[in-house]
Amino acid sequence: FGVNVKEKIRSLKENIDVLTLTATPIPRTLQYSLMSARDLSIINTPPSNRVPIQSEVIRFDNNLIRDSIRFEIERGGQIFFVHNRIDNISEFGIWLQELVPNAKIKIAHSKIEGKKLEKIMLEFINNEFDILLSTTIIESGLDVPNANTIFINNAQNFGLSDLHQMRGRVGRSNKNAFCYFITPPLSSITDDAKKRIAAINQYSELGSGFNISMKDLEIRGAGDILGGEQSGFINDIGFETYQKILSEAVNELKNSEFKRLFKDDQIDESTTEET
């Protein structure tokens, strides 16, 4: 959702209390909490019987992909395979079917008619086929405890929040889950993409959403606190310097200036009475 959509509720009623729930707050939203403009509560305790997802950054390796898919199917599980290009997802599906001929594969993306797409999703939830090859439409809202392996193709093209959400499609039971971030050689991707891949691979423990959001804030910047931009760049001064300047400005507005004003008023009143 954009800033205008999220803030629209405030136009309906003044001084309304708003509770925002998110796995990975965007930089602008997180910055509000860090500068004490909003209260922040963190849920660090995962649901019972969950285990951390084993994450790995890999090159596009046919043997590794085939072996990982076979392992998951042999233990009775299912697989998500994210390929975020509708224009060639059908061709990609043909390659995948040739790689694992015995697997049942179906494709899902936003251009499929609604009822047909819903039918595919329900069939996957009901364990009627093995691999769901899809775009990022599976990013949120799907709870398939039997799906415990996910491949994310060209992971370097996604934001940290997207990667975290997609990884969260697996590991929703007490089984070991696996997430494979498929990227080109790291030498061929941008510096920010390297930082995102390193961060998502580092923070794989349960309850890491806040750490990932902090890293996202550091990489992308806080955005426009008073305007509509949800992320921005603070490379010119550095993240720590930006945080310090912002905190000092907020504290000055909240405390220092007001205290000084009230103190001056008291002095003026006492002086007037003595006179």
Positions of PLM-derived features:
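Post-DEXD/H (motif II) to motif III coupling segment of the RecA-like Helicase ATP-binding lobe
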Residues: F1-Q78
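C-terminal helicase module of SF1/SF2 nucleic-acid helicases/translocases
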Residues: T20, N62-F80, N84, N88-T275
